[in-house]
Swiss-Prot record:
Signal sequence, start to end: none
Organism from which the protein derives: Buchnera aphidicola subsp. Acyrthosiphon pisum (strain APS) (Acyrthosiphon pisum symbiotic bacterium)
Quaternary structure note: Homotetramer.
Enzyme class, spelled out: oxidoreductase
Family: Belongs to the short-chain dehydrogenases/reductases (SDR) family. FabI subfamily.
Gene Ontology MF: a single term: identical protein binding
Keyword line: Biotin biosynthesis, Fatty acid biosynthesis, Fatty acid metabolism, Lipid biosynthesis, Lipid metabolism, NAD, Oxidoreductase
Active site location: Y146, Y156
Catalytic reaction annotation: a 2,3-saturated acyl-[ACP] + NAD(+) = a (2E)-enoyl-[ACP] + NADH + H(+)
Pathway in which this enzyme or protein is active: Lipid metabolism; fatty acid biosynthesis; Cofactor biosynthesis; biotin biosynthesis
Protein name in UniProt: Enoyl-[acyl-carrier-protein] reductase [NADH] FabI
């Protein structure tokens, strides 16, 4: 019997079979969780329904997280199927491609700053705020981050600021929701090949550098991340909240580890 049997989780931001969210969904499903999915719009809904069909979910909803009315409608629609659920995975990030290149100060604009923070950081808070009353006791909430929140990564630029904001929101939401026995955590992973990652100039060089300086010499996969996510969403991790858990083969604590 899976350790998530009887629990219901909403996966927000799944986009393709290569997305981290898909790896998390597979792991949750393998542990017998019941899943619901949220994609960006009707244009890709049919594709996502086909993608998650093996996970036997009847819930594939759409939501534009930049719009509060859309977020409210999302949970009204979800409430027609689930009155209560046990947590969500926030796998949403966005920054226009032109900001993933060149000098940080030269390239940043007010518009780029605002949209990166609104979609990548505030959306997690807005979603949780809207569904708070639907969350069961001992629910668990999870988001995805990256080391660029703590260190300068070439070309990551304004997204590093947005991820730092996201990680701060994890701590503050953990404080707000602790009295309701609801936990909030983040996973910070190695660079993973996804559709979104190729917006970043020289992504392969960044990925190769991470690999060369990591202690473990195997590539982190979305399934690896999914297994950690399953643990954090389960009752096996009841004592963990407000934390950023690194799934990066030790890269976040390494220093010139590739020098022989």
């Amino acid at each position: 019997m899976g350790f998530l049997k009887g629990k219901k989780f909403l996966i927000i931001g799944i986009s393709s079979v290569r997305s981290i969210a898909f790896g998390i969904a597979k792991s949750l499903y393998n542990q017998k969780a019941e899943l619901g999915f949220v994609c960006q719009n009707e244009k890709i809904r049919k594709k996502i329904k086909k993608l998650v069909e093996p996970m036997k979910s009847c819930i594939v909803l759409c939501c534009d997280v930049s719009n509060d009315k859309n977020i409210k409608k999302l949970f009204i629609d979800l409430g027609q199927v689930w009155k209560k659920f046990d947590g969500l995975v926030h796998a949403i990030a966005y920054c226009p491609k032109q900001y993933f290149n060149g000098d940080f100060i030269d390239n940043i604009t007010r518009e780029g700053f605002n949209i990166s923070h609104e979609i990548s950081s505030y959306s997690f808070i807005g979603l949780v705020k809207a569904c708070r009353t639907m969350l069961n006791n001992f629910s668990s909430l999870l988001t995805l981050s990256y080391l660029g929140s703590q260190r300068v990564v070439p070309n990551y630029n304004v997204m590093g600021l947005a991820k730092a904001s996201l990680e701060a929101s994890v701590r503050y939401m953990a404080s707000s929701l602790g009295k309701e026995n609801i936990r909030v955590n983040a996973i910070s992973s190695s660079p993973i090949k996804t559709i979104s990652s190729y917006k970043i100039t020289n992504f392969n060089k960044i990925r190769n550098c991470s690999y060369a300086s990591s202690f473990l010499k195997n590539s982190v996969t979305s399934e690896n991340i999914g297994n950690v996510a399953s643990f954090l969403l389960s009752d096996l991790s009841l004592g963990i909240t407000g934390s950023v858990i690194y799934v990066d083969n030790g890269f976040n604590v390494s220093s010139m580890n590739n020098i022989q």
